Regions:
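Catalytic active-site module of serine/aspartate enzymes centered on a nucleophile-bearing elbow/loop
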Residues: 241-294
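Short beta-strand/loop motif that positions the catalytic acidic residue
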Residues: 212, 218-220
């Protein structure tokens, strides 16, 4: 089993396949590296594909202190993987919690990024939803500590942005729920309390987003309601970003629509690798509603 060790001594389990420029996949709260199996098989044919389990998700270490978990730490853990594999730069691909970590990696370690793919990112970010989200994160952490993972998975797997997977792919949804139930209750609770609840709102990061210059893809499902407006916010403020929306899809787009997801991400990476990824033309930003040149 392969592990990278962070600067605070936490071991992160990872798997890799293929060769070429590294692509590091960063999983969501309700998933782990197994969630990226469709991507590991697909992108491992062309790239050095790497997926790892975040701290708190066995077989990675599970620190028992909430202070060991934070949004900054999640971004720095990606760097620990990158340093361990001996690569200078990598394409970083994240979903949900992993999408937030990918964005923050781009902010904190932009010089180490070949590109950023930020998926399903934004829930709880809107100013009028911020305190509601913090309260829900605290409630989830308490529920995990009290009732454990199996009971939690039975509720969380049927949320409003998860039923799309159930309707399209009942077997895939059952597998998603089974893997979620196998997670560490302590690690998941600490992740909710330390990372999710305490992370800054995207609306507080606008100036930081404006400084991102590496090629960026923002991707979300059109029924992932909490992530749609934040996706537009990121598109507006990252000049090197494109926004892709997968129709009739919820939150876990990489397992819900793996072929479409792989196609979109694959086209993005190919453009980046060829040096053809565009930056927004400043003339595209106008105060004109009708489209007249100022």
């Amino acid at each position: 089993m392969a592990y990278a060790t962070t600067d605070d001594g936490v071991r992160l389990y990872f798997e890799e396949t293929g060769s070429g420029h590294p692509v590091i996949f960063v999983h969501e709260f309700a998933g782990d590296l197994r969630s990226y199996e469709p991507q590991m098989r697909h992108f491992g044919k062309r790239y050095r594909a790497i997926a790892f389990n975040a701290r708190g998700f066995p077989p990675s270490d599970v620190p028992t202190n909430v202070s060991s978990y934070s949004q900054a730490r999640a971004a720095d853990d990606i760097l620990a993987i990158l340093d361990h594999i001996g690569a200078t730069k990598a394409h970083i691909v994240g979903l949900s919690m992993g999408g937030f970590a990918t964005l923050h990696f781009g902010i904190r370690h932009h010089a180490r990024s070949l590109s950023l793919c930020i998926g399903g990112c934004g829930y709880g970010a809107e100013p009028d939803k911020r305190e509601i989200f913090r309260a829900e994160a605290e409630m989830i952490a308490a529920s995990l500590r009290k009732d454990g993972m199996v009971a939690f998975a039975e509720r969380y797997a049927y949320g409003p942005t998860r039923v799309q997977l159930e309707n399209k792919d009942p077997r895939g949804h059952a597998e998603f729920k089974r893997m979620l139930a196998e997670h560490s209750a302590i690690g998941s609770a600490n992740t909710q309390a330390g990372v999710q609840r305490e992370r800054p709102s995207l609306y507080d990061l606008i100036e930081e987003m404006k400084r991102i210059s590496v090629p960026t893809l923002i991707i979300t499902g059109d029924e992932d309601w909490p992530c749609l407006l934040p996706g537009i916010l990121m598109k507006q403020n990252i000049s090197s970003a494109a926004l892709s929306v997968i129709p009739n899809s919820g939150h876990a787009i990489n397992i819900e629509e793996p072929e479409e997801y792989n196609r979109i991400v694959g086209d993005f990476l190919a453009q980046v690798e060829s040096g053809r990824w565009p930056h927004r033309d400043p003339r595209a930003v106008s105060a004109s509603i009708t489209g007249m040149r100022n």
